[in-house]
Amino acid sequence: MWLFVLFDLPVGTKSERRDATRFRNFLKDDGYLMLQFSVYARICRAEEAVDKHLTRVIKSLPSKGSVRALQVTDKQYARMKLLVGDSSKNEKAAAQQLVLL
């Protein structure tokens, strides 16, 4: 099971940039992999883990912007296609995590 967090945060002022950076750092510290600059994904073992991490995200939300969460099964994640560019180190590590679970 995967939990995706997708966001679009304002960065027009210094405080907005600081809030956006704090949110991205929170996601990285909580084990999310950056797939794109504002798209992060985390592997979760069960529905309870998804709920736990979603609660953490909600507690860390910045005051402005748009943040969305999407829950995806391992099978759906494996069917994701990279259309342009190369897989990042994070994505390769995520594929290895799938094998371990």
What is the predicted role of each segment?
Residues 1-4, 9-101:
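Basic nucleic-acid-binding interfaces
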